[in-house]
Amino acid sequence: MTALDLSSTVGVVGTGTMGQGIAQVALVAGHPVRLYDTVPGRAGEAAAAIGARLDRLVEKDRMTAAARDAARARLVPAGELAEFADCTLVVEAVLERLEAKQELFRALEDIVGEDCLLATNTSSLSVTAIGGALRSASRLVGLHFFNPAPLLPLVEVVSGFATDVTSATRAYETARSWGKTPVACADTPGFIVNRIARPFYAEAFAVHEAQAADPATIDAVLRECGGFRMGAFELTDLIGQDVNESVTHSVWQAFFQDVRFAPSLAQRRLVESGRLGRKSGHGWYDYTDDAEPVEPHTAEPADRPAYVVAEGGLGPAADVLAMIREAGIQVREEDEDHGTRLVLPSGGQLVLADGQTSVEFRDVVYFDLALDYRRATRIALSAGHDTLPQTLSEAIGLFQALGKQVSVIGDVPGMIVARTVARVIDLAHDAVAKGVATEEDIDTAMRLGVNYPLGPFEWSRRLGRDFAYDLLDDLHLRDPSGRYAPSLALYRHAYATEKREGAS
């Protein structure tokens, strides 16, 4: 099944930010577009707003004046739904209320032709549930655009339980013909992005709730060490704490309160206090005019160690050994492999985050996972109460000698980046095993939908088969709530190459 012909009329119901954005996308692609809103006059106002945005595209040389004029001529505000009778595709972008969407599509069934494709832009409701009220849900598909729709390339094409392959394929190809990057997924809570992205927020909030680090430090580590474009606290302030918490709560409830998706009490308190982020002037951060910028915790300069002893290859942090040598610090290598660790002159150990805690060992400092140790500008370290001050000082001095800012956080297993990435990888493997989407589509969705530096499977391949599983298994031993229990899919992935002779 091919994409809709450009002569096909596209109807958009709902004229808020998303409705206008979707209408603009279809319009610029070349379709005639009809806009409808239940509030009289709103469709005309939305058409004028879209026209103004087209003017700005002309001013920026992204559109010719002739193309703008032609697009304006194709955009028609509708006074009633009956004017959608000749539409070949209708996309709804109304309030996220199941009853409202069901009522709308029931009305559309009596208006449009049998070959008209119906699409919902829902981000949190079940496509299957929406279609449950229709006489024939086979032509209903989810088309989840990301805001702002004209700018962001990703579209999740969601098949409900009754959606037929022809409808899903037609929606997919149409989105692609509009210049978007579609990904196909099953109707699951959160679809791809809002399902797999939950740990990015949840683990940052958990580290904060454990009093291990403040929001500014956690955000800085996620950006400068993890390679994420924004930290979890600043991003949720931008999204709106109420909006982000609502999505988290919706996914958690849809998964029957699965602890892996549990909301954050700290975020709940923030919402209850009215601190919703940028839009209210205060969230995790203060956005009032006279507010002072909050700086991350950064360690004072410390002396570099004269040497380190390498025991093992440091696994995903192998580049650190080369960087130490390049910094002029002697590396002594031991033949016996005791794991991925460095021994400092104090006798203390420097170990890559592995889901254990410093307090379990005599004299250990953990360092966090980095997307790219060479490009990272900040590294997080954690130490227990029994860690010698000299050991911590040497660890700080070592990474400072490599050109890194150092943030010392509390002794939490898995630290910040490592536990976040491990959980994202786990949810991604679980989603594939349950038929939600392919590995390729999940990687694409996470890179384009939430700007991750790598897709979960790309990250998994870089870290090695067992990194995420082993870290989460260690975390699960220390927090047996089930939050960190590795999925069966991740277990299979981690040990796919290890075979036993038989059952005992």
Model region roles, listed by residue range:
Residues T2-L4, A29-H31, K180-V183, D187, ...:
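NAD(P)-dependent Rossmann-like dehydrogenase/reductase catalytic/cofactor-binding core
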Residues T15-G16:
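Glycine-rich Rossmann-fold phosphate-binding loop(s) that bind the pyrophosphate
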Residues G19-Q20:
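N-terminal Rossmann-fold NAD(P) dinucleotide-binding loop
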Residues A26:
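Aromatic pocket-lining residues of Rossmann-like dinucleotide-binding sites
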Residues L35-T38:
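Conserved acidic E/D residue at the C-terminus of a beta-strand in Rossmann-like folds
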Residues R42-E45, R56-L118, L125, I329-S358:
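Rossmann-like NAD(P)-binding element
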Residues M63-V76, S138-R139, K180, R362, ...:
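A short helix-to-beta-strand connector/capping loop
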Residues E103-L154, S159-E173, R341-L392:
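Rossmann-fold NAD(P)-binding glycine/threonine-rich loop
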